[in-house]
Amino acid sequence: MGISLRLAEQFSAEEDGGGGGGNLVFSPLSIYSALSVVTAGARGTTLTELLAALGAPSRDALAKNAAEIARALAGGTATGGPRVAHACGLWHERTRSLKLAFRDAAAASFNAATRAVDFLANPEEARKEINSWVAAATENLIDTILPPGSVSTDTGLVVTSAIYFNGTWQTPFRKQDTKKDKFHLLDGHGTVDADFMRTGEDQYIAAHDGFKVLKMPYAHDHAAPQPSPRYYSMYILLPDERDGLSSLEDRMAAAGGGGGGEGFLSEHMPVRRVEVGEFRIPRFKLSFSRSVVRALRGVGVNAVFDRAELPDMIEGEPLRVSDVLHKAVIEVNEEGTEAAAATAVLMEGAARYAPPPPPREDFVADHPFAFFVVEESSGAVLFAGHVVDPTKS
């Protein structure tokens, strides 16, 4: 999903007039899934721009990758892993049928459910129905994705993508060890008192030039029968410098020749546990809610909003995308992580060698850092963001 880090860069640039001064959480996977469904009905420049942003050479390759991610994300609860639910929906005006090839492609690659609603006569009721679907898909962490007035009698189709994640750490932190400490804000703006989780257990840590990476695996039952392993981890990328977050994120986004920087993450992942010295990371709870059109334009997606070529989606007048709305929430604490996200695309007319033990590593996340929640086998980035003030949501 090459779009992940380039979107993070765009969102950061939007904060504080380009100062990047706010916390951030979003779901690359939710946005990727929703845009992939739109791509299944696109042609011409619209198709070219969407494929480039999503990092796919063709529509078939994109559909194949989406199907592989869907298989990798099949709920892990039965195998002792995190609970993961991912769903897509197509909500079309009931007087306009979806084209059969588009409907079948969306169902085959994205498991997208199709529902006919009455945008023309009762757009408010349709909005409530879509919001109820999102609330159910996200365990009510996100109770609404479409605000009042977002759909109208002109709405022809809404594409939704929702994800829910709930995982416990492989080694949970002890609550009694959590204590207040200073977290340093950006640009010398002082400190805040934050709740820091602590442990003396060995950790997956890798030290690189200018930053460190911490991997925190989620619990998984290795003995449980399953067709393929599903492993989830959170990665925290901590710059050495207290004000180093922006340059680190620029470095990540630039990696891979515009491919989005996921290669940067995979190349710097820790591979073994090391003894820790001083270790503490803050608890945090973040949320995000906005239109992501500006960010998508920033990564080269323009035609779909202007002269959209989307003739393969629905009968009658071709559509254009009028808005893309995204919401995300995440909470990280001693037990693990609970997170959810939803995206709505609104469209209307128009081992034998044993090396010596590595040195002991400190990992003190007392200044701004980036984080990712990743499914290891597919590399899918479920959630991404950064923390600049863990006391604010």
UniProtKB/Swiss-Prot annotation:
Residue ranges of the region described as RCL: 336-360
GO MF, one annotated term: serine-type endopeptidase inhibitor activity
Domain of life: Eukaryota
GO cellular component labels: extracellular space
Presence of keyword Secreted: no
PANTHER family the UniProt entry points to: SERINE PROTEASE INHIBITOR, SERPIN, SERPIN-Z8-RELATED
Protein name, per record: Putative serpin-Z6A
Species this chain originates from: Oryza sativa subsp. japonica
